[in-house]
Amino acid sequence: MTNHDSPQPTAEPGRDDSRLHRFEDEERRPYRDPRDATDVDLDAVNNRLHYALYAVYCLVAPLPALEDTRRRLVGESNYFVDQSEVTTRGWYDVSGFRSDADLMIWRLDDDPEKLQDASHRLRASALGRYLEPVWSCMGLHTPAEFNSRHIPACLGGVAPRDWCMVYPFVRSYDWYLLPDEERSRIMAAHGRNGFSKYPDVKGSTLAAFGMSDYEWVLAFEADTLDRLEGVIHHQRYTEARLHVRQDTPFYTGSRVSPREWAERQPRA
């Protein structure tokens, strides 16, 4: 689903943004991307329940060799899954980044059972016979502790980008016992060291307490892979890293249509 004709943010006057360095000292100025909505009611987002389900699969058998058969397989399966009426943020080709995964699907809804239904439907579909679950994580939007105006990109009107990186994390045991002021300071510095230099990278942080082995699940989106690498790399140089017990596995891939994904897979 890559769209190289998407309108891009305007570069700062007098500055060559044709190749943005990963470790620029200068912070880039915030901007609005024309692809994104600007009329989102943030209070309404915070006052409702919003769930996300990230599901990762591996291909366990080659898809049919005939093109018409593959297209019918994917089309009918996707139609069956769509009856769950959840929002699909994207299908992502994660092949090659890891040896254990080929597909990641990101879905959104205010009802976790509908997200489960979509997952069940895919497993029960014709395409599902070729897929085996590798990893999944459910997340719930909760208002940000220190800034309730900070909304996950996936709920804040931000259009999907061409690349996505998803990973869970667990805080240190002492993190939640630190004074609020100290945690606020640490997180502010963490944000400045990453997103202030990479404002084109959009983040969605959701709570996962009690829904998996993790406390949080994050999704970063950007138009190019190097921007995702850059923001993650930059944020390693912060005090917040001292308060992380786990932040793997990572699943990263390009956004594609179901048909595109199928055309890239091995064939019988």
Residues covered by each model-derived region:
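Short, surface-exposed beta-edge/turn micro-motifs
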Residues: 50-52, 101-103, 162-164, 214-217
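Glycine-/proline-rich flexible loop or hinge segments
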Residues: 59-63, 99-104
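Short S/T/G/P-rich N-terminal loop/turn motif that feeds into the first structured element of a domain
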Residues: 2-82, 110-115, 134-196, 209, ...
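Short, charge-rich binding segments
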Residues: 96-97, 114, 127-129, 156-158
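A structural feature that tracks compact, well-ordered secondary-structure segments
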Residues: 57-58, 93-94, 104-110, 119-121, ...
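Short, glycine- and small/hydrophobic-rich beta-strand elements in well-ordered beta-sheets
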Residues: 78-101, 128-143, 192-217, 231, ...
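Aromatic- and glycine-enriched beta-alpha-beta binding-site module
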Residues: 112-132
